[in-house]
Regions:
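N-terminal beta1-alpha1 cap of cysteine-dependent amidohydrolase-like domains
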Residues: 1-85, 89
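Fold-independent oxyanion-binding glycine-rich loops
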Residues: 6-9, 32-34, 66, 90-91, ...
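Catalytic-core segments of thiol-dependent peptidases
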Residues: 83-104
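Active-site-adjacent pocket-lining segments in enzyme domains
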Residues: 97-101, 106-119, 126-211
Length: 211
C-alpha cells in the first residue's frame, strides 16, 4: 500500500496521485470522521472543499461515515473492498482513532497494508494516526472520548515507524504548539518527521521504503 502523507490537504505532489490513477483507477472513499466533534457547517465545508480538489486531481469521490460501521467490521470490509483508495482528512486525531477502532477500519488497513495497488491519502490528523503512538499530540488535540465514555486511544496504527508532525513552521493557528511537540519528541527520543504545509511524504509500505 502507498501512503501519501501530507500536512495540509494534498500538498505539492498531486502529479503522483494523477499517475496512480492512470495505473489503477480513480474511485476513492473520503473519510472525515476526524471532524466529528466540529460543527456541521465546518464539516460540510471541509468535505466539499476536499471533494472539489480530489475531483480536480481526477478522483471520483464517495464520502463515507465510519459511524455507519461501528461494531460491524464485516460490513466495512465488504463495502471498502470495492475501493482501493482511501482519503482520511484532518481534524482531531483522537476522535479519528476512536472511529477507526469502533468501525474496524484500523484492522482493515493493517490487513491490506502489505498488498499492492492500495492507496491511503492522509493529511493532518489523517497522517498523524499512522505512527505508533498518539500521546505526544495531547497538547495539540484534546484527547476527548467522543463516541464512548473512557475511550481515548493513545496507540496509533503502527503503519510507519515514526511520528508525523504536520504544520511545521507553517501558517497554522497552533504553530507554537507544533514547536513544543517537536521539542517533546526530541526530549523523549521519539522518532519523528516534520512536514510543512504543502510538503508530502510518500511511503510504499508494501516494499518498506520511502518513494
Amino acid at each position: 500500500m502507498i501512503l501519501y502523507i501530507s500536512s495540509k490537504q494534498f500538498g505539492y505532489q498531486t502529479d503522483f496521485l494523477k499517475n496512480w490513477i492512470m495505473k489503477n483507477n480513480n474511485r476513492i472513499l473520503l473519510i472525515a470522521n476526524a471532524l466529528d466533534a466540529k460543527d456541521e457547517m465546518k464539516i460540510k465545508n471541509n468535505i466539499e472543499n476536499d471533494k472539489k480538489i480530489l475531483n480536480e486531481i481526477g478522483f471520483e469521490v464517495t464520502v463515507v461515515d465510519l459511524k455507519d460501521y461501528f461494531n460491524n467490521q464485516e460490513k466495512l470490509t465488504k463495502d471498502f473492498a470495492l475501493y482501493n483508495a482511501y482519503c482520511v482528512i484532518g481534524g482531531n486525531v483522537f476522535v479519528l482513532r476512536q472511529a477507526m477502532k469502533l468501525s474496524g477500519f484500523d484492522n482493515y488497513l493493517k490487513k491490506i497494508s502489505k498488498e499492492e495497488n492500495y492507496l491511503y491519502i492522509g493529511y493532518s490528523a489523517g497522517s498523524c494516526v499512522l505512527g505508533n503512538e498518539l500521546g505526544t499530540f495531547n497538547k495539540v488535540d484534546e484527547p476527548i472520548s467522543f463516541y464512548l465514555k473512557d475511550n481515548v486511544i493513545y496507540e496509533g496504527l503502527g503503519l510507519i515507524n515514526y511520528t508525523v508532525i504536520p504544520h511545521y513552521k507553517s501558517d497554522y493557528h497552533k504553530v507554537h504548539l507544533i514547536d513544543d511537540l517537536v521539542k517533546r519528541c526530541i526530549d523523549e527520543d521519539i522518532k519523528f518527521k516534520t512536514l510543512k504545509d504543502g510538503e508530502v511524504i510518500i511511503e510504499n509500505i508494501e516494499k518498506d521504503n520511502e518513494v
